[in-house]
């Protein structure tokens, strides 16, 4: 029933928090509960997001969570969200990670975004970020009545939390069974990757990248013209021999390499 919490303190607004969470417990009606999709995929997304973003500093603090006992009533996340509200923590957004590895055969990768209308601003924010990085991907707001997840614990405490889900109609038929395994239940690593990429994009954008955490030492002998540039950029280096250039976005994505 334990929760595991990791905090990256913000450099400018340490008392404003962006929270990224998942549940680490698994449940099965048959006794065997491997939990590959529900919810190893969500935990993996949180860990990978933390790994990538740990290389940078952000103006707001980021909290990474792995909650216990979600399957028996959101126990771990309820306790934590209740505590956050009790001490007056300013959580600007919660991003839930729960089941992102099953793609219904024949479907294209998409995201079903679950949230109540009361937190529509963060739902709109998620869709706007998706439109920037993956404009071809469908993201649809849905109301899911057949189950619940840890975002609700934050919503009930007045925080804005959303739940990107694999498919509210055609989610893995193998969850809560001994067949929740890689293969039948987690059948699309590409979809898990896409959900994790969206996690990284949304968390890092809302947390506000601290530009000072991006080292410019290596650029001291390189000039750029014009700066900023729109269509054409000329780089001049004092280094002789072969030079390798990478253009990297603020989210750590390699945009161009030559």
For the regions a protein language model found, what residue spans apply to each?
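Acidic/histidine-rich catalytic neighborhood of metal-dependent amide-processing enzymes
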Residues: 1, 28-118
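A non-catalytic alpha/beta surface segment that caps or lines the substrate-entry region
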Residues: 1-8
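Short beta-strand/loop motifs in extracellular/secreted proteins, especially
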Residues: 16, 60, 241-245
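Short beta-strand element of the alpha/beta-hydrolase
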Residues: 17-21
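Active-site-adjacent substrate-binding region
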Residues: 102-210
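Low-complexity, Pro/Thr/Ser/Gly/Ala-rich linker/spacer regions in secreted
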Residues: 207-220
């Amino acid at each position: 029933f334990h929760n595991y919490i990791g905090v990256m303190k913000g450099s400018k607004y340490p008392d404003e928090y962006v929270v990224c969470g998942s549940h680490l417990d698994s449940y099965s009606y048959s006794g065997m509960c491997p939990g590959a999709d529900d919810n190893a995929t969500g935990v993996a997304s949180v860990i990978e997001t933390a790994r990538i973003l740990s290389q940078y500093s952000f103006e707001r603090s980021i909290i990474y969570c792995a909650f216990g006992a979600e399957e028996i009533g959101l126990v771990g996340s309820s306790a934590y969200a209740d505590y956050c509200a009790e001490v007056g923590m300013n959580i600007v957004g919660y991003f839930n990670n729960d089941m992102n590895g099953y793609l219904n055969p024949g479907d294209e990768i998409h995201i079903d975004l679950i949230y109540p209308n009361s937190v529509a601003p963060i739902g709109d924010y998620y869709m706007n970020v998706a439109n920037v990085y993956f404009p071809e991907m469908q993201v649809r707001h849905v109301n899911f009545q057949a189950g619940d997840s840890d975002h609700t614990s934050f919503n009930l405490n007045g925080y804005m939390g959303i739940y990107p889900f694999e498919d509210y109609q055609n989610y893995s038929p193998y969850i809560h069974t001994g067949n929740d395994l890689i293969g039948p239940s987690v059948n699309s690593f590409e979809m898990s990757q896409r959900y994790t990429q969206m996690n990284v994009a949304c968390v890092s954008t809302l947390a506000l990248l601290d530009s000072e955490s991006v080292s410019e030492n290596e650029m001291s002998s390189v000039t750029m013209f014009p700066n900023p540039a729109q269509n054409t950029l000329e780089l001049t280096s004092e280094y002789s021999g072969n030079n390798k250039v990478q253009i990297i976005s603020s989210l750590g994505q390699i945009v161009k390499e030559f």
